[in-house]
């Protein structure tokens, strides 16, 4: 049926040329950027600023040795690699802090899930605790590890 109609009513050739001209103008690539040679982000954005260190409490010459990492967002509807990283870091339970070393391999894993976690430096105002005092330490929400001193009772001397 379509063949009969085409033979009965041929299209004028001028109309086809108009469509071609319109198609060429749409296909034209002068509005597309072909080369990505220059970065759109200025280099000064990536340079460290002293205000950042004051704001976040870091010292670039003496970085902290340990991180306190807390998961603050859910892993539901997140990709499997983020869930695997959260499990690897031991952050399955939300709002329970974990302590990790400040080394490049751990920092690379933290960078993958940085939008799901909070990272704080571990502050040791009383120094690193020993094995005996490890059981009597308390981790504050500010990131300080405080050793709770237990008072030993004074032995009463027997009255003579």
Swiss-Prot record:
Keywords, in A-Z order: Mitochondrion, Ribonucleoprotein, Ribosomal protein, Transit peptide
SUPFAM superfamilies, per the entry: Ribosomal protein L30p/L7e
An MF annotation (GO) of this entry: structural constituent of ribosome
Annotated Gene Ontology cellular component terms: mitochondrial inner membrane; mitochondrial large ribosomal subunit; mitochondrial ribosome; mitochondrion
InterPro entries in the cross-refs: Ribo_uL30_ferredoxin-like_sf, Ribosomal_uL30_bac-type, Ribosomal_uL30_ferredoxin-like
Subunit comment: Component of the mitochondrial ribosome large subunit (39S) which comprises a 16S rRNA and about 50 distinct proteins.
Record's protein name: Large ribosomal subunit protein uL30m
């Amino acid at each position: 049926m379509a063949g009969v109609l085409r033979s009965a009513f041929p299209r004028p050739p001028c109309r086809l040329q108009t469509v071609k001209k319109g198609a060429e103008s749409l296909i034209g690539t002068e509005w597309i950027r072909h080369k990505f040679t220059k970065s759109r982000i200025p280099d000064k954005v990536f340079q460290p600023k002293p205000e950042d260190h004051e704001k976040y409490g870091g010292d670039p010459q003496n970085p902290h040795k340990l991180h306190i990492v807390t998961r603050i967002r859910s892993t539901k509807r997140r990709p499997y690699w983020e869930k695997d990283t959260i499990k690897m870091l031991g952050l399955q339970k939300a709002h329970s802090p974990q302590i990790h070393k400040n080394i490049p391999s751990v920092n690379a894993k933290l960078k993958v899930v940085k939008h799901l976690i909070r990272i704080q430096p571990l502050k040791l105002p009383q120094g690193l605790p020993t094995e005996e005092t490890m059981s009597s330490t308390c981790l504050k929400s500010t990131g300080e590890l405080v050793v709770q001193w237990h008072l030993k009772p004074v032995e009463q001397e027997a009255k003579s």
